[in-house]
Amino acid sequence: MTKKLTYLLLFIPLISLSQGISLNVSQDARLALIGDERGNGAFTTNVNLAAEFRGWQKGSSYFLMRPEIEYADLKGGELYRMTANFGYTFNKWVKNVDFTATVGGGMLSRHGLGGLHTQANLQTTWYFTKGIGLFLDSEFVQRVDLPKKFVGYSGKVGLKILLR
């Protein structure tokens, strides 16, 4: 109980200081549609859930912080990742379209082992109605559970909902 209360108290300043909050839900497109070369078939679950806390608008962009969790039901074992991302969103270049670049790092768990990872994301969001957008996310990630690969790539499709 005290652990949950501590986490809640840590998020209160983020919520009160942020100029906007959104909820992002995404799925790895390749794993959803065709699978991959590691034996994961189509319809493999690989879901990301993120909360995006926006800073003050400065010109054509704003700073953001995006904590994120990922769950993937992969062949050979489940993957859990927690990431803290920081970056900028450029939202004044094209009407109803945001361009976001972030970098982040965090922890992952797979095959009973834990480790650190780093990542960089490029995301494009198209708002098809007020407060709801569809996004494409290109993720470049360094994970300890990927043998013989320094950087892996993932393309995600998702929904962004502006809460405030």
Positions of the model-derived regions?
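Cleavable N-terminal export/targeting peptides
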Residues: 1-22, 164
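Short glycine/proline- and aromatic-enriched beta-strand/turn motifs that initiate or cap beta-hairpins
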Residues: 17-64, 69-71, 156-164
